Amino acid sequence: FNNVKVSGDTRFDRVVSILERDNSLDFIEQFKDNTTTIVIGSSWPKDESLLINYINQSSDDVKFIIAPHNIKQEQISNLKNQIQKKTILFSENVETRLIASLQEYNVFIIDTIGILTKIYSYADIAYVGGGFGNPGVHNILEPATFGVPVVIGPNYSHFAEATALVNMEGCISIQNQTQLNEAFDLLLHNEDERLEKGHICSTFVQM
């Protein structure tokens, strides 16, 4: 798959440089609290309709960070209201409460921009949104560079890196609720599978 990566491709250059910077975020570390965490990045309503169903029936030994594509207040409120787990917004906590209280929550909604890439460094599993829309999935290289296995929707054929990673089995493409549930359950309950797919992702970015 070396032909996928064009020499001088700024997308690859940028994500590789991400590893050289400080990606720590104290409030994410407090929220994660050494718990297995799924980071959902750039999600759209179609993604969220499936993800919310999974979140609401999930056990408390997994946490979720959601960074929606649309962070308008109405959209964020609607998202939060559908989630039955203990949920907090970035705007509710980071500047107004003690960070230590974050570990009490199951879901953290990031209603701000500019920090998603750093958040991916804390992910055990990533879901990258946009794959149910047109033109398709958002940037999967950001979580991949941290060695995180990625789950996406079905529309990815216009993106060479997504196509390559699906073919290499570092990334799982899903089309419906059942497939999403199966993908997350596989990655949550099979550590070897999770680590292997993550290794495929990180190796691909650095090729």
Enumerate the predicted regions with their spans.
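Nucleotide-activated sugar donor-binding and catalytic core shared by glycosyltransferases
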Residues: 1-207
